[in-house]
Amino acid sequence: MTTTNRNNLKLTALTAAVLTLSACGGSDAVAENKNVKPAYLGEVASASYDGISDDLLTAGLGKTGLGGAAPAVVDPLSPTSAELRKLAIFNNYRAILDITAGGGYGTLYGPNVDAKGVVGASEGMIAGTEYIAYSDDGTGRQNITMMVQVPATFNPASPCIVTATSSGSRGVYGAIGSSGEWGLKNGCAVAYTDKGTGTGIHDLQNDTVNVQNGGRASATAAGKASIFTALLTSIERAAFNLATPNRFAIKHAHSQQNPEKDWGKWTLQSVEFAYFVLNQKYGDLASDGVAHLKKLTPANTIVIASSVSNGAGAALAAAEQDTQGLISGVAVAEPEVQLAPDARLSIVRGTTTLVGTGKQLLDYFTLANLLQPCAALVSPSTNVFNTVNAAIAGNRCSALKANGLITGTTTAEQAASAMAALVAAGWQPESSDLQASHYSFATLPVALTYANTYGRFGVADNLCGFSYAATGAATSATPLAPVPASAAVLATSFGTSNGVPPTAGINIVNNNSVGGPLLDAASLSVGGVQDYNIAGALCLRGLVTGTSANAVRVQQGMSEVLRSANLHGKPALIVQGRSDTLLPVAFTGRPYFGMNKIVEGANSRLSYIEVTNAQHFDAFLGFPGYANRLVPLHRYFIQAMDMMYANLKTGAALPTSQVVRTVPRGLAGTAANPITAANVPPIKAVADVADQITFANNVVTVAD
């Protein structure tokens, strides 16, 4: 059973008047610490879930439903908010985790595995109340979605809050399967935010947008309540549609806000929202009989900043920026974090030494976007995500050679040169297996999104000749060209989109393809050659390395997202897979650990855990080519959260920095063996000498 209420947390005009009058009392009254809604928060909507028909963690699907087929929508053109929420939780949970039994779902992790790791027979549904609001500056241009889930097991006598900032560019449910699940199982309130990304899809042809409850509306009707509306006048939009019909603006790419610079701020605001909700629920009434007092504060509440990927980077940023003592400790996995250049730091693994803090995200993504299609030809990966076409990849190799970026006479030599260039740039040799698949599904989408957001480009800028559109089927009258989007796909986009096209039926288009705009991967370069759009790739790279006006804009935005690695002595754990190909350890976890030691010195309480045979996308571990080679990093995320909670609750020591050596599942015939505890040994309290990660004299030494 679900109940909803949009008014129970509003401070009405009457309440405000009562508070004002009570404040006029005599000077002998003791000042009360009243709970006040933060000024940046809009109207708060709430819904309660009974944990039987619906719940906080699985939207009523339970462990079985999350592992099954996508939930049906009765009317695809007009889905209900409840249906969209269920779709969002289903898709976001599965986007983070491997939901195959052989990979550990239902045994190592999952709704039926309790907070102590005990496997149960229940569906793992969690009762409680969910609160949602926008954070905004009054313009409606930000509209950061904030959400707090309070499980029925929350104990105000032993309170805890866990942050769950969305990973990737996902919406507010993006971390439901990572820190969200851990927090709910442990009886903590969970503070979510989409951090200014999420499902903000503006259909420019039809002028429709997403709104907070998941539905779609005309941009005019939505007004300031839109998740995102492109900053175009009606005249500008009409001109854009005439020149480039059937296109879309996407919030993370086109909000012109560079939200990443404020990911720490939004995460801290989500904690403040959680405190407001909890004190409204558990705080005693003030003497006026209307307001509530602050019962829960940072002095008596454990707050763990957490999440994975971009959400993990947001947690680290929040801890760096925390001036109110809101955060007690940090436990994150595979963080997207970018550091100011600092040549004092060196990182050594075996015979390889890298000097400095690593490349910034757009630097290494635009480099990968150039090299990966060619390197794919020698990538050992044979998994289902390797969709690189050998002939087109060969043409990319030729184009790279012509531009002086690789060497070699034959295609094989050129491909080997491209792979060697990636390793020389900082990717670990263990990533070579995954370079092909990452180009197939991740590299260009991320590079294009971040080039746009860092430069604060609008959709009408068509940066580097790229745009977003639905494209026709290969057998249609307009094969692979922009076409009107499916109304049903757009109607359910809140529940299906990951915030970065290609998603929800929206693809990446090369506007400059010879003969007219086409799906980028199939587009034609000068001379009618298919080479994965070398001109577009070179243009994106030039935004990082060049001096053009557009490059200056992008580089300014890049400078705004740099972090300090100063956690102010907070206890912290970072876990990351050595084979991470999306966010390589040489650019993220390793240098963050080293710079934290440099800037904090003896005050540093950060431990860094690097896991062999683990990479960025656990959700892909159920597929051939991934399943037999790699293990779930999520197993170590859970352990890191447990260790951090024990440290904050009882003072238990955090583990020393170390390499955890896992054992791939391998094959039994053509299928991967079921995972066992032997494949994923635990983090040790004290690392063996051969597994230590150490810091001394500004040098991080990582066990090989």
UniProtKB/Swiss-Prot annotation:
Its annotated pathway reads: Lipid metabolism; butanoate metabolism
Q: What is this protein called?
A: D-(-)-3-hydroxybutyrate oligomer hydrolase
**Which GO terms of the molecular function aspect are on file?**
hydroxybutyrate-dimer hydrolase activity
| Protein's organism | Albidiferax ferrireducens (strain ATCC BAA-621 / DSM 15236 / T118) (Rhodoferax ferrireducens)
Provide the E.C. number(s) assigned to this enzyme. Answer: 3.1.1.22
Q: Quote the subcellular location field of this record.
A: Secreted
Q: Which residues form the active site?
A: S309
**Entry-linked Pfam families:** 3HBOH (PF10605)
Enzyme class name: hydrolase
Task: Supply the source organism's classification.
Answer: Bacteria, Pseudomonadati, Pseudomonadota, Betaproteobacteria, Burkholderiales
